[in-house]
Amino acid sequence: MTTEALPLTLAEKVWQDHLVVKGEDGSPDLIYIDLHLVHEVTSPQAFDGLRVAGRPVRRPDLTIATEDHNTPTIGIDKPIADLTSRTQIETLRRNAEEFGVRLHSLGDIEQGIVHVVGPQLGLTMPGITVVCGDSHTSTHGAFGAMAFGIGTSEVEHVLATQTLPLKPFKTMGITVEGELRPGVTAKDIILAVIAKIGTGGGQGYVLEYRGSAIRALSMEGRMTVCNMSIEAGARAGMVAPDETTFAYLKGRPHAPEGEDWDEAVAYWTTLQTDDAAVFDAEVFLDAGEIEPFVTWGTNPGQGVSLSQDVPDPADIEEPNARAAAERALEYMDLKSGTPMKSVPVDAVFMGSCTNSRIEDLRAFASVIKGRKKAEGVRVMVVPGSARVRLEAEAEGIDKIVEEFGAEWRFAGCSMCLGMNPDQLAPGERCASTSNRNFEGRQGKGGRTHLVSPLVAAATAIRGTLSSPWDLEHEDADTRTGEKVGI
């Protein structure tokens, strides 16, 4: 159990509890890994390495695989058309069978985006270490876990040893105090954080999100915030566990039961940053000042409130940042001074490991219910897992989506990244609930604006970047953010 000789942050407590060997003379520590998540893109070479060395997977019981990045979101009962995608998925299936790793394949009720599947199964728990060959592994930090992405060589190392050599991360406390206004969500919080500290502001840090606004978030909201810690340059993001965490986990398939549950909760309640602990850096935000947010450029830090205009690079003092803004505006085909609300879109994507859970789908559906999408705008709604999809259909969300004129898809990473059939055409502009807006991220030449599910829904209705606030002004009968339950 954690020793309390010195005041520690949450991240430091979890690190100490997983220390196998303390590094000396500048060498890294050796850290034990409790949960290893695997998908089809970053695992083939790792399994090949095991095969060449004649090594087994050391802890197949702590390893779980799912198919997500390359999977189609329509016609999942048909052969995968793209050769590369099909090969990667077939390779994962062979590797999982050969090495005894549990795999959730297409058609399995538990298949889906790896960072949705882990929490919904109760595999992600407070105080554990989680790794995956995917940068958005930070999602799992919402439970008070130390969770971070690793490269393919590290995937092999964990498969072989269930450990990783690592140097301790720095810690940054991000405190968000106050109450969010109706229509403002967890996605707006993290976009505001990234806009404040920049895409490199968290480099080398574990970010711990704190304050009354964070505590008021659901687990889905906390996962959204922690998910995009990587877009701030951080290694991981964490939220200390509390009753909200415990309520989410209780009764899930892999959560402890009976006396084991009581013992687990007793330990989990110790996973709080000590009052006297000192962060290496701290950032503070006022939740009441955060508005619905949107990115205008080609990195997640290039964002503004939706009520603002496209910024002028001339107002940016730092030369590299100014040059990046100029290039971003050219790629995005935007002019300085243009109101963000006047920017038209060709597509809306509702999905990704950032915003594809049942709460996200409910929020989106509550805004579009009884309405029709804007003419000429393609709207794609992709649940994060087969189980989320089934739950949404039981609530009638699929019917709301289809009556709205949108596409209701099967689970997968989908249009978050240009690695499967769901892509933008060159020049198309998309309001997306995903996490990255780099050049070509959603397809070669595609232009991405990162938004919340509520902004995505309002944008799909109006055809231009919009929030529920805009719908409220247009129609007195339109559901407001309060009625949406956000």
UniProtKB/Swiss-Prot annotation:
Pfam families: Aconitase. GO terms for biological process: L-leucine biosynthetic process. [4Fe-4S] cluster binds at C353, C413, C416. Its EC number is 4.2.1.33. One of its GO terms (molecular function) is 4 iron, 4 sulfur cluster binding. Its cofactor is [4Fe-4S] cluster. Coiled coil: none annotated. It comes from the Bacteria. Keywords: 4Fe-4S, Amino-acid biosynthesis, Branched-chain amino acid biosynthesis, Iron, Iron-sulfur, Leucine biosynthesis, Lyase, Metal-binding. Binds 1 [4Fe-4S] cluster per subunit. It catalyses: (2R,3S)-3-isopropylmalate = (2S)-2-isopropylmalate. Pathway: Amino-acid biosynthesis; L-leucine biosynthesis; L-leucine from 3-methyl-2-oxobutanoate: step 2/4. CDD domains: IPMI. Heterodimer of LeuC and LeuD. Belongs to the aconitase/IPM isomerase family. LeuC type 1 subfamily. Catalyzes the isomerization between 2-isopropylmalate and 3-isopropylmalate, via the formation of 2-isopropylmaleate. NCBIfam families: leuC, PRK05478.1, PRK12466.1. This is 3-isopropylmalate dehydratase large subunit. It comes from Leifsonia xyli subsp. xyli (strain CTCB07).
